[in-house]
Amino acid sequence: MAKTRVHELAKEFGVESKFVLEKFKEMGEFVKSASSTVELPAEMRFRKEYGEKLKAEASAAPAAPAEKPAAKKAPAKKAAATAEPEALAAEPAAEPAAAEAPAAAEAEAPAAKAAAPKPGPKPAPVAEQPAPPAEPEAPEAPEAPAASAAPAAPKAPAPRPVGRPGAPRPGNNPFASSQGMGRRPAPGAPAAPGAGDNRPPRPPAAREGGVPGRPGMPRPNPAMMPKSPSAFGAGPGGRGPARPGAPGRGGAPGRGGAPGRGGVGTGAPGRGGAPGGGFGPSGGGRPGGGRPGQRGQTQGAFGRPGGPSRRGRKSKRARRQEFEAMEAPTIGGIRVRKGNGETVRLPRGASLTDFAERINVEPAQLVQMLFSLGEMVTATESVNDETLELLGEELNYVVEVVSPEDEDRELLESFDIEFADDEDDEGHFEARPPVVTVMGHVDHGKTKLLDALRHANVASGEAGGITQHIGAYQVHTDVDGEDRKITFIDTPGHEAFTAMRARGSQSSDIAVLVVAADDGVMPQTVEALNHAKAAGVPIVVAVNKIDKPEADPTKVRGQLTEYGLVPEEYGGDTMFVDVSAKSELNLDKLLEAVVLTADASLDLRANPNRDAQGLVIEAHLDRGRGPVATILVQRGTLHVGDSIVAGPAHGRVRAMLDEYGNELTEATPSRPAMVLGLSTVPGAGQNFIVVEDDRMARQIAEKREARERAAMQAKRRVRRTLEDFMASMEKGESQELNLILKGDVSGSVEALEDALAKIDVGDDVSLRVIDRGVGAITETNVDLAAASDAIIIGFNVRPQGKATELADREGVEIRYYTVIYQAIEEIEAALKGMLKPEFEESTLGQAEIRAIFRSSKVGNIAGCMVISGVIRRNAKVRVIRDGAVVADNLDLASLKREKDDASEVREGFECGLVLRNFQDIKEGDIVEAFEMREIPRA
């Protein structure tokens, strides 16, 4: 299903796309344009917040067309309103004359061509200056309106409004028609608020050819501005008459007639009817023209600016930013704004780009800072939590990495979904079966006990007789004539399956702790007990194997009392049942104890009339049916055809099967079922939820997959510092064992990876799991192993297709295992074999030099007596004189017994030897022979 676009939403609610974009911006959603798509959570939020309001406004929309004509006149009203305060402030009595001005100007337009403008009354001068000379008559100047004949009281210029946008500064473009010096504003432009004009606006004259000018707008009058000393000589000047045949613009007196505007008149033919366009003193501004308070403008095409630019006062925000930049810490030559100790929330596996967006800095700055701190990280690379916390501490930020639970909850809340929401109406609750987890030490009979309860033989199907999967079953029992259902979850007992036991205890209501009567309490028994206590579930103890001769149930009760499980017969509150799974003894009493504990301690009710939510117990990849997930419904009812999302997997439920392979149409609370139809294999222990449609399920799954991938990359990334890099360059590359794990179920793969991660054989050898998955070994796995020099570990799986041939051709090793501890032992041995060998010195013997024979051919020959051990020909020797080592790590050039060469000479025999490259020997020196022996690495 395609995503909704912004313009589609706007069309649906009858508003403009701009309005929808603004609302998304207020909501904090980044939407670029009207054609951009909108994610489903953002669309739902928009509909929830603005949908009803927009629909209500749309229902009242028919009254809007009547107001459209008035809306079109708004600009004219606005312009009139702008000029109205000035006209009222100048002279209220001039309003009737100003109203009649357009008609008078229209009647006198033909006569205006030959008539000179009548000078209006001048305001009182602000500063004493010589009066300007009389204006020359302009041939195209219009006749003054009647309103100008009435003198108005002079008034001081009104203060300029704060924040008035200034005119754009002209550039140094020599090809422009005007550079802005003494440039007349366009006809019809609104008057400047601070112009100080105390006369009503002069109506525009008719254009040549009888074409009327633009509607009369108040024209700025520089003559009424305060005068300033001129940089140039004051004098009349004009732009000259208009070109023949060219209609000139308005007939108002030009700037040349204003005091201080005349001077260097160009006289070039230009716009007609506006004398005085030359350079001159600007009224109230700096040399170079412009309004009062405006920046200096250019004097020529490539000339200097008209004066020093006045820099405005900096705002508080600008000053604060400059101060923060000066106070920012400098790390590795990079200056970054320092935080105030605020908390920055980041997801797992976040990159430096994510961190930079939170604190409003450039990612490249953080990359350089980490490089100076000894970490080589790219801007888009997933970074582990320690690195983010280190960087945040340097910048005075508290980095809080969001936990996976909070991360998933925030994701679901963005789709208006709440997991584990039990705040339903009490009237909708119905009783559900208890969920019981069977836990205990390995080989204490947990699976055998479940086989006896459900009359099956699961233990025979497990490799080595050890449960390596989580199984979920539902059995029926008769308690006081009532048929009761109990859901059992079987967990492995091996130490490598700690996480699977923890998942089992957290998803159950009651824990059945199985303890063998002959072995007693074992390490995994205590661990399972701690998991059950941490989950806060009641415990029922099943003392198994009581039919064996060496069984001692009393000893088991005494041992468990030390861990806080006091039997009822001892005055406690824990039920103990002596059973035998092999003989099927007292199994009914165990089921009755489970039901009584559930009725007495728990309120087992759920709402079946809602969308299903629950837990993925186990998942695997079936060759014929695809991904198969064993789920446990915790609330609601799951139906065939529901859209479901479980971790990174999503899809529609195509079929449901029970533990016996029978098809189910629905799964009620506490009902385990196998679900078919998912896109991929979900992780064991992940939650599943039913959503509205496939589109929402796909979006949730994709976001989860992206977050898991980022977290996995940050977890796998080897922290490589500059010091480590330099050291590895000096002494050679360190050894690294790359593995690819493939298993039959996701829980076993997870347990194997966790167990391998705990193997520690030193810093010289490292273990890296580059890929893991569920299902058969494929050619893709072999290609990856060949490219990364990895070994493939297959746990209860075999190669598929031509993967074996490809592995033989590429030289990739594939190891197969069915029991987890065999894989752990062999991989640990392989890691130890990759270690660099360690050597220790072993002393072989000593010989005393009794005589020295000199030979011109071989040098000094030492005649020795072996006083201890043995002297070997290929051994290393050292020379000791008076207890001090004179020479060390020497080779024997020759060793003879009498005249024959000898490989070794034992204690009590004489020999002659020659030391290679050492002749400084004396009688009485001790020659000690030794060798370096390799010792195994522990």
Swiss-Prot record:
Compositional bias of kind Basic residues: 310-319
Region (G1): 440-447
Annotated region described as G2, given as residue ranges: 465-469
CDD domains noted in UniProt: IF2_eIF5B, IF2_mtIF2_II, mtIF2_IVc
The keyword Nucleotide-binding is annotated on this UniProt entry: yes
Bias type Pro residues, positions: 118-136
Secreted listed as a keyword: no
Ranges for domain tr-type G: 431-603
Domain of life: Bacteria
Job of this protein: One of the essential components for the initiation of protein synthesis. Protects formylmethionyl-tRNA from spontaneous hydrolysis and promotes its binding to the 30S ribosomal subunits. Also involved in the hydrolysis of GTP during the formation of the 70S ribosomal complex.
Protein family according to the UniProt entry: Belongs to the TRAFAC class translation factor GTPase superfamily. Classic translation factor GTPase family. IF-2 subfamily.
Entry protein name: Translation initiation factor IF-2
Taxonomic placement: Bacteria, Bacillati, Actinomycetota, Actinomycetes, Propionibacteriales
